[in-house]
Regions:
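Family-specific signature for flavin-dependent thymidylate synthase
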Residues: 1-235
């Protein structure tokens, strides 16, 4: 068995906390219609998994569940959450998803922020609709890395002053730069919901920061459902 926790970037990670089911689960969840069951994952079972995925018979994939803990910048978390909300317009993807996030109303651990390295800043894409283009010149990146560092340092100073003056955490947090701030959350989804997330966030036009996390989710999910996930991602 591989690692259950994968580092992402300088500070982030994805941790597989728990799961329910195996590759054999969607097979037997589909076979219940005929009051049959398989005890081993052979070629027939693998063909059935592929058939179910290819023909969008997705309900058998909703009984298997994965539970992740994620530590990522808020801008990644909000994209992730938007995907979960949007899935309600699909074939019930949201019915087996859950989300619980840490709150700075209650915790005062030292804030962590995403600060891109000078060579990690990206340009506006040619079509200008969304996403990003090629990296900007390093000297331009250096300017904005330094500017962001100064901005965060001043924000942290104001946050700490407010806390020292007995301002409540739920208001003191207003001084923290939101989108760069790392947050921690637990995300639980059915195997189908996880595959739906991966199909969107592994795409080349997905934002790099969330794509990095999606690659970690994929590695962890493949550890537990190699055949079923492959079928869903290639359907």
């Amino acid at each position: 068995m591989g690692k259950l926790k994968i580092p992402v970037g300088e500070h982030g990670y994805v941790l597989l906390k728990d799961w329910m089911g195996t590759d054999l689960s969607p097979v037997n969840d589909a076979k219940v219609s005929f009051d049959k069951e398989s005890t081993e994952l052979g070629d027939r079972e693998k063909r059935l998994i592929k058939y179910l995925a290819d023909h969008q018979h997705t309900s058998p994939f909703r009984h298997s569940v994965l539970k992740f803990e994620v530590y990522a910048p808020l801008m990644v978390a909000r994209q992730w959450w938007k995907h979960i909300i949007g899935s309600e317009h699909g074939e019930g993807f949201d019915r087996l998803t859950a989300w619980n996030e840490s709150s700075r109303r209650y915790i005062t651990e030292e804030p962590t922020f995403l600060i891109p390295k000078p060579d990690a800043w990206r340009s506006v894409p040619e079509n200008r609709k969304q996403g990003s283009g090629d990296p900007v010149a390093v000297e331009v990146g250096e300017k904005y890395t330094e500017a962001l560092q100064k901005h965060i340092a001043e924000s942290l100073r104001l946050y700490e002053v407010a806390m020292a003056d007995n301002i409540c955490p739920e208001q003191a947090r207003l001084f923290l730069p939101a989108y760069a701030l790392y947050v921690r959350w637990v995300w639980t989804g059915s195997l189908q919901a996880v595959a739906h997330f991966l199909n969107l966030r592994l795409a080349e036009d997905a934002q790099k920061e969330i794509r990095d996390y999606a690659q970690a989710v994929e590695k962890l999910a493949r550890e537990k459902f190699p055949v079923a996930l492959e079928a869903l991602l290639n359907a």
